[in-house]
Curated annotation (Swiss-Prot):
Region of interest: Disordered: 1-82
Annotated ranges, domain MPN: 92-222
Species for this entry: Homo sapiens
Compositionally biased spans, kind Low complexity: 37-74
GO terms for MF: cysteine-type deubiquitinase activity; identical protein binding; metal-dependent deubiquitinase activity; translation initiation factor activity; translation initiation factor binding
Protein name: Eukaryotic translation initiation factor 3 subunit F
N-acetylalanine modified-residue sites: 2
Function (record text): Component of the eukaryotic translation initiation factor 3 (eIF-3) complex, which is required for several steps in the initiation of protein synthesis. The eIF-3 complex associates with the 40S ribosome and facilitates the recruitment of eIF-1, eIF-1A, eIF-2:GTP:methionyl-tRNAi and eIF-5 to form the 43S pre-initiation complex (43S PIC). The eIF-3 complex stimulates mRNA recruitment to the 43S PIC and scanning of the mRNA for AUG recognition.
Reactions performed catalytically: Thiol-dependent hydrolysis of ester, thioester, amide, peptide and isopeptide bonds formed by the C-terminal Gly of ubiquitin (a 76-residue protein attached to proteins as an intracellular targeting signal)
Length: 357
């Protein structure tokens, strides 16, 4: 059975005093008020200078003007939304799996598709929004309309809730280096599920020689009684990762120094050796710092001193003979486990040959 899509059409641009992208409207048989209102500029008279100032984008902000669209009833993305307004000072923390998923969906996009879009999932606290997961959403774009498969997005979110019930809908992402008039229309749909949703852009075309990653929130702006516009305000983007994600990131970073951009998985012994080498380098740095402080080359820092003292106190005090006995015992256990594993493997191989006779 075909999955229903929600078509959205964008008519020709209507001039507005806001320097932004071409306005776009959403045709609907039954207009309805927006479910999640977005903070707008305070009302002011047309003769008030503050009203004219409200129509000018502030430095560092990306304006995109669009006529306030009439709401079209569409399948809603279920789940809790961002609590309250999204302050401009809040930080967006991205996990590596987000970037990997976006790039993978872009590489697997349909033939002729200019970009891909998807839903962002994560958690919210007082000072930051942490994006921990995402999934792509099928859509079709042309010069005058965009159709988004919201039923697919609803089903995918229901599946994600079964695995991670704490993840909320935070916004959406799109590949590309700019915000188009279609982005304003798609943003309206996500505004119904998350007040002031995040719009994440990932420049997969590498226009500036790197993959630019930016996050925005939208704000209504304009002169009362005139066509309202939408201004996308940039947010601070930082990167976060769990310990398990850090292992994958370190492995991917090693491909930067490989001529063919390919690197194999290291063995357990190589991982232990690499970790030991990093610990040795860290200890050398600490010893050099201590020597510089004692010689007067560097002024002493009480915070660093307390941290080093706490680190030294955490090291267990073991008699050298006891440590050697423990190490030899662990090595013997490891050798025994290895021997039993090889013996079991040989027995299984022998059994397979006897069965096939």
């Amino acid at each position: 059975m075909a999955t229903p899509a929600v078509p959205v059409s964008a008519p020709p641009a209507t001039p507005t005093p806001v320097p932004a992208a071409a306005p776009a409207s959403v045709p609907a048989p039954t207009p309805a008020p927006a479910a999640a209102p977005v903070p707008a500029a305070a009302p002011a008279s047309s003769s008030d200078p503050a009203a004219a100032a409200a129509a000018t984008a502030a430095p560092g902000q990306t304006p995109a003007s669009a006529q306030a669209p009439a709401q079209t009833p569409a399948p809603a993305l279920p789940g809790p939304a961002l609590p309250g307004p999204f302050p401009g000072g809040r930080v967006v923390r991205l996990h590596p799996v987000i970037l990997a998923s976006i790039v993978d969906s872009y590489e697997r996009r349909n033939e002729g598709a200019a970009r891909v879009i998807g839903t962002l999932l994560g958690t919210v606290d007082k000072h930051s929004v942490e994006v921990t997961n995402c999934f792509s959403v099928p859509h079709n774009e042309s010069e005058d309309e965009v159709a988004v498969d919201m039923e697919f997005a609803k089903n995918m979110y229901e599946l994600h809730k079964k695995v991670s019930p704490n993840e909320l809908i935070l916004g959406w992402y799109a590949t590309g280096h700019d915000i188009t008039e279609h982005s304003v229309l798609i943003h309206e749909y996500y505004s119904r599920e998350a007040p002031n949703p995040i719009h994440l852009t990932v420049d997969t075309s590498l226009q500036n020689g790197r993959m630019s990653i930016k996050a925005y929130v939208s704000t209504l702006m304009g002169v009362p009684g005139r066509t309202m516009g939408v201004m996308f305000t940039p947010l601070t983007v930082k990167y976060a990762y769990y310990d398990t994600e850090r292992i994958g990131v370190d492995l991917i970073m090693k491909t930067c120094f490989s001529p063919n951009r390919v690197i194999g998985l290291s063995s357990d012994l190589q991982q232990v050796g690499g970790a030991s080498a990093r610990i040795q380098d860290a200890l050398s740095t600490v010893l050099q710092y201590a020597e510089d402080v004692l010689s007067g080359k560097v002024s002493a820092d009480n915070t660093v001193g307390r941290f080093l003292m706490s680190l030294v106190n955490q090291v267990p005090k073991i008699v050298p003979d006891d440590f050697e006995t423990m190490l030899n015992s662990n090595i013997n256990d490891l050798l025994m486990v290895t021997y039993l594993a090889n013996l079991t493997q040989s027995q299984i191989a022998l059994n397979e040959k006897l069965v096939n006779l």
